[in-house]
Every structure is written in structure tokens, then in C-alpha cells.
């Protein structure tokens, strides 16, 4: 889908003259060692010529308060080594000065540094929060502005789009760009916050399918989000070293279209590359085969990150405890993956809040058997709870509830006859006591509107059922994916 989408970013900044490369780039607010850095500042300067530039200045407090200034109403002009910007419209008597060649208190020139200072005339500044953009901003030399006017973040021989500009409606991502001193970089893709301050992003093209659009990058844009056109991810499991993953084969299985995919586990998202296929091989086994990973019938992917990052991504989990997703670029680019905690065996089980249980019980009119907290966002703004009811008329019933604040935002109920044989695609897989238990949350994805898609794996001794719950209004829509047979012994 990404190759077919034409998406855009605000950026027709024109060609950048070589003389302006001396100061074009990204600058970060500096703090002394004895200062408490509870906020950050970033200044982006994109040259339009030797004496004009577009700029973006952001100051963000850790609590969320933000100042954003930019040159929406026209570029700033260099005069006597300073860019001076005045708040547009006349509503505020406010001036921002960006001095390119500042000196220390002792008169020593400060290289790769810009001094930002604000001047408030009569009245108050345009913001009413306890922040100020004042300070010294030091250049991050890993960022550069290419002749096409885009800002890139370099790493080795490659670079990724870091800021596509802010004031036009289209960006065409090139295959290569010329950086400082004439060095040619291969453009690897787009960073996740490259469009964070865009206003009318409507059209962008990428040069080739090997370029990657980072997680959440398109959530900032005006590109239409259509769940029905996004390629669904696949459930997968890892080898013992957790650097290779396989999507087990099932009837009707079609391998992902692109060789480059992303592996998702909890909030971790890492690039991967196609590395094997055993579909149709005589000795291949369909299901989860932990004892003989390479005999799994399916499609294999290898992570493209260092071992240290793999260890961090799966810290606290052995391979046999992991189910993950293999996802195409369009799914990853249109969703964010917030950090969350989940229940993990053998941790102590936590009951869901009593007020939530009461809300769910009233909604469904059943007597509660037990409740469980399944997973909760670390920012405190979202929680998945599970409530199982007493059996009624030989029927078992469990409800998943997505909680925001103190209220039930969306629910999904699952029922089954307790005396029936469970279908192969059933997500119940009840334990010996006839209860549902707690499924493993593989990841929680958020779409551009903030709705969640929760991917779960329900483990039992002989199989794993993979499904998802997608928030649609006040309902969690259940999406069945696959059920794996778990091989215990291999003859």
C-alpha cells in the first residue's frame, strides 16, 4: 500500500545554496551540569539562500506543555549575523532573535551554536506557561540540510528524512542525497516524527520499496486512514536466540508482499528481512515447533538490529514465552505503539477495579465469577480488563473491557457452551477448571484517532489462539487470526 500511496509533507523550500550549509541543520538547547533539564528545546533551520531561512522552534516540558514557533508567514532574513522573527498579526509585541555566531561571556566564539533570545514588549508573551525558548542551542552534526531543502539524519552511509519542511504539500523522497562536503548518502526512509509539525500533508512518494517509513510517521498527516485497505499483520514466534521469526503456515496463507517487514513485540518495533521459506517442504511441520524452529512450515524473517537491541526489546522473556507480529510498512506507519505493562506468569494476578467490574456486570446482567487486569498503558490512559461471569444455562461468558480513566470505553463479549467441543478457531481454550484465564497481550496499537487495536495470544498446553480486539465506538470488534498446534514431542 505504501508504494501506491502518494503522501505528502509541507516542503517546497527550493534549492539550498552551498554557502548556507554552514548554519542549516538541527540545534538542541543546552543545559549546564547543575541545571535540572525538565524540558527540551529544538531549533531547525532550513536555508533558502545565504541570507534567508525557514525555521521551526519547539520547547517541550516533560509534563506536556509546548511552545512552537515557525516561519509559516514567511522566511526570516539574516541581518548582522542574526535572524529576527516577529510574532505575526500584531496581537502580541513579541520578538525572537536567533544569533548565529554568539560569544561566551569571555568573548570566545561558540562554534556550531545559536543563541536564542526572546523580547516581550508591552503585555504578555504568546504563551501562558512557565517555559521560555531562551538559551544556547548547539548543533547536532548528525543532521544536515540537503540541496533539495529537506533535513536528514545521517548514520554511516545512510540517512533518513528528519524534517520534510513545513510549508507546502508534497515531498518526493529521493533514493540518494548529497550531504556536507559532497558526500552522497543513501536515503533509508522517513523518521517517525519527520511530519510532527506538518499542517497539510497530502502527498509523498518514496523512491523504492526498500525505504522504510518509521512507526507512527503517517499519524501526523492528512492522508486518509482506511483500516480495510491496510495489510493486516501476521502472528509469529521466535527461535531460541530471538533474532529470527517465523509466520506459521495455515490454510489460505499468503506470504507478505514485501521482503522488508517489521517485527512488533509490546511497544518494541524493529525492522526485519525475509530470510527463508519452508512452505511445501516434506519435513516441515505446521504449528509452533520450539524444539525444531527451522522445521516450522512458514515464512522466516531475520531482525535487522544489533544483538544488544534485540536483548533490550525482549528483556525478561524467553523465546518460548513470546508471540509477536510481523507487519507491513503501511500498518506500522499508520499506528503508534505506546508502552504498556502486562500480566506475565507467574506474577501475582491483579483484580480489575471494583467500580469497573460493577459497570461491566450492570451492562451484561450477569453474576461475576472473577476479574483480572490484563494490560495497562504506562501513561495511565488506558487499561484492558477481563471479567468472567458465572455459568448460566450451561453457557460460559467472558468480557474484555477497554478502560479509559474510570469508565468503560469499549467491550467485547465471548460466549461458549461449556459442554461442547471447542472449535479449532475458538479463542476460549479454557483451563481444567473451565475458566478463561488471562491471555498474553502481544502489542497495543493506536490508530490516528487514538482508537486501540489489541493483539492477543491465548495459550493452552496444546495450542495457541491468536486474535485481536479493535475499538470501534463503544465496542471491541474481535478479529480471529490463527490457531497454532503446539508440538510437544517430535518423532
PLM ranges: what are they?
Residues 21-107, 119-128, 134-140:
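Central antiparallel beta-sheet cores of small beta-barrel/beta-sandwich binding domains
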Residues 144, 149, 166-189, 198-214, ...:
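Structural signature of tandem-repeat unit edges
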Residues 222-339:
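N-terminal leader/presequence regions that precede the main folded/catalytic core
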Residues 346-362, 402-430, 469-477:
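Surface-exposed loop/turn elements that mediate protein-protein interactions on large endomembrane-trafficking
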Residues 369-381, 440-448:
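Structural signature of eukaryotic scaffold interfaces centered on beta-propeller domains
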Residues 380-388, 448-456:
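Acidic/hydrophobic-patterned starts of short beta strands in beta-sheet-rich repeat architectures
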Residues 393-401, 462-469:
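Structural motif
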Amino acid at each position: 500500500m505504501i508504494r501506491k500511496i502518494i503522501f505528502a509533507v509541507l516542503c517546497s523550500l527550493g534549492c539550498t545554496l552551498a554557502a548556507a550549509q554552514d548554519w542549516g541543520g538541527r540545534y538542541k538547547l543546552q543545559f549546564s551540569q547543575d541545571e535540572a533539564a525538565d524540558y527540551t528545546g529544538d531549533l531547525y533551520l532550513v536555508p533558502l539562500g545565504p541570507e534567508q531561512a525557514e525555521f521551526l522552534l519547539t520547547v517541550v516540558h516533560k509534563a506536556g506543555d509546548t511552545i512552537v514557533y515557525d516561519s509559516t508567514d514567511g522566511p526570516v532574513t539574516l541581518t548582522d549575523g542574526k535572524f529576527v522573527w516577529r510574532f505575526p498579526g500584531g496581537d502580541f509585541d513579541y520578538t525572537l532573535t536567533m544569533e548565529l555566531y554568539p560569544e561566551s561571556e569571555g568573548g570566545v566564539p561558540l562554534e556550531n551554536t545559536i543563541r536564542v533570545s526572546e523580547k516581550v514588549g508591552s503585555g504578555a508573551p504568546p504563551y501562558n506557561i512557565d517555559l521560555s525558548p531562551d538559551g544556547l542551542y548547539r548543533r547536532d552534526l548528525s543532521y544536515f540540510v540537503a540541496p533539495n531543502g529537506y533535513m536528514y539524519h545521517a548514520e554511516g552511509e545512510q540517512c533518513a528524512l528528519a524534517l520534510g519542511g513545513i510549508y507546502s504539500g508534497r515531498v518526493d523522497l529521493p533514493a540518494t542525497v548529497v550531504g556536507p562536503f559532497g558526500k552522497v548518502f543513501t536515503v533509508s526512509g522517513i523518521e517517525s516524527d519527520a511530519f510532527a509539525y506538518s499542517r497539510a500533508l497530502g502527498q509523498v512518494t518514496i523512491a523504492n520499496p526498500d525505504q522504510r517509513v518509521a512507526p507512527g510517521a503517517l499519524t501526523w498527516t492528512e492522508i486518509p486512514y482506511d483500516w480495510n485497505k491496510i495489510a493486516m499483520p501476521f502472528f509469529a514466534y521466535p527461535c531460541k536466540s530471538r533474532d529470527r521469526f517465523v509466520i506459521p503456515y495455515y490454510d489460505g496463507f499468503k506470504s507478505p508482499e514485501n521482503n522488508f517487514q517489521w517485527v512488533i513485540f509490546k511497544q518494541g518495533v524493529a525492522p526485519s528481512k525475509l530470510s527463508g521459506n519452508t512452505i511445501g517442504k516434506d519435513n516441515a511441520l505446521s504449528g509452533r515447533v520450539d524444539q525444531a524452529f527451522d522445521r516450522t512450515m512458514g515464512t522466516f524473517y531475520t531482525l535487522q538490529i544489533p544483538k544488544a537491541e534485540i536483548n533490550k526489546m525482549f528483556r525478561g522473556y524467553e523465546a518460548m514465552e513470546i508471540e509477536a507480529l510481523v507487519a507491513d510498512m503501511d500498518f506500522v506507519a499508520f499506528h503508534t505503539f505506546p508502552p504498556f505493562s502486562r500480566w506475565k506468569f507467574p506474577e501475582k494476578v491483579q483484580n480489575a477495579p471494583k467500580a469497573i467490574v460493577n459497570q461491566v456486570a450492570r451492562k451484561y446482567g450477569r453474576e461475576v465469577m472473577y476479574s483480572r487486569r490484563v494490560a495497562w498503558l504506562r501513561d495511565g490512559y488506558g487499561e484492558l480488563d477481563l471479567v468472567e461471569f458465572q455459568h448460566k444455562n450451561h453457557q460460559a461468558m467472558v468480557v474484555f473491557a477497554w478502560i479509559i480513566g474510570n469508565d468503560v470505553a469499549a467491550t467485547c463479549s465471548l460466549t461458549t457452551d461449556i459442554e461442547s467441543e471447542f472449535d479449532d478457531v475458538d479463542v476460549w481454550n479454557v483451563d481444567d477448571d473451565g475458566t478463561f484465564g488471562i491471555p498474553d497481550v502481544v502489542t497495543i496499537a493506536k490508530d490516528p484517532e487514538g482508537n486501540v487495536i489489541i493483539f492477543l495470544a491465548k495459550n493452552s498446553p496444546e495450542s495457541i489462539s491468536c486474535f485481536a480486539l479493535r475499538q470501534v465506538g463503544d465496542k471491541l470488534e474481535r478479529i480471529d487470526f490463527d490457531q497454532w498446534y503446539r508440538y510437544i514431542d517430535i518423532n
